[in-house]
Amino acid sequence: MIVKAFSSSANLGAGYDILALAHDAFEDTIEIYAQNSSELDIKVEGNGVPLSIDKNSASFALLELLRSYDIKAKIRLKIIKGIPAGLGLGSSGASAAAAVYAANEIFKLNLSRQELVNFAMKGEIASSGSPHPDNVAASLVGGLVSVLNSNPVKVEQVPLNLEFQIILIIPFVRIEAKTKKAREMVPKQIDTSKYVTNARYLSSLLLGFIKGDRELVRLGLNDEIIEKAREPLFPHYPKIKEISLLYDAIGACVSGAGPTIAIFVDSKSDKNKILGESLNVCKAYGYECTYKIAKVSGGAWVERRD
């Protein structure tokens, strides 16, 4: 069986560990083959991916799911990475999402996509040391998802009534264990005033998407806490955001733990100016850089059944 899952951008300003948006910029492919066996055995294959089960988000999530249902099988798991890792695009989450979605289909577990999030998020332990559900939820469910509870996990898809595209500015800045490092930079204590400001941003963002109000979304795509604390990881961001707003983007934010910047644009935005000048900012910082123009995507899907 072949299953695919799309990339995603998490946080979206003030929605740290709450919001993530699935988009069609990139996709991961999982090929999974299962045979009857007296014991559970998983073999990982793929170029440029960890082959150890406990170091690979897809195999780690798959193992958690199969153990929970006491499934014994010989599994061959081939991972074809289309989503670049370490750039804030939900790479590890997409692989984990595709793996558990495939297992659910093969073993006819009849679990909902929401139920699968509980297992897919465990795969993030392999990549970042903590089981955060935002990216995996987006890749599994599709669209914009909000994490409403973490134990037990509850996620809901947020209605999107605004037409937009996402310009992803992708600098090739490689930081060892970046997601783990970025999570360690999150402040343990914050001023109440900053908390209130962020809560207002998050409310504005959600209302903007639901009501189709670009000005509310623009206000909501801000953050006074996490992005500020992590700014040393992506010094290019403030200038790119400034340029984006100058040329009437809906808004801009750091995609996940960065360094990718997500710029939300529509028919009012000067996309060419935004793109050209944003790429120039990356060059000024000495970064090799590329871009993608993406649309909101659906969740994981089966491409081929064997």
Swiss-Prot record:
Protein name: Homoserine kinase
Catalytically driven reaction(s): L-homoserine + ATP = O-phospho-L-homoserine + ADP + H(+)
Known EC number: 2.7.1.39
GO molecular function: ATP binding; homoserine kinase activity
GO cellular component: cytoplasm
Organism: Sulfurisphaera tokodaii (strain DSM 16993 / JCM 10545 / NBRC 100140 / 7)
Gene expressing this chain: thrB
Keywords, sorted A to Z: Amino-acid biosynthesis, ATP-binding, Cytoplasm, Kinase, Nucleotide-binding, Threonine biosynthesis, Transferase
This protein's pathway: Amino-acid biosynthesis; L-threonine biosynthesis; L-threonine from L-aspartate: step 4/5
Homology family: Belongs to the GHMP kinase family. Homoserine kinase subfamily.
Keyword Cytoplasm: yes
UniProt xrefs under SUPFAM superfamilies: GHMP Kinase, C-terminal domain, Ribosomal protein S5 domain 2-like
Domain of life: Archaea
Entry-linked NCBIfam families: PRK01212.1-4, thrB
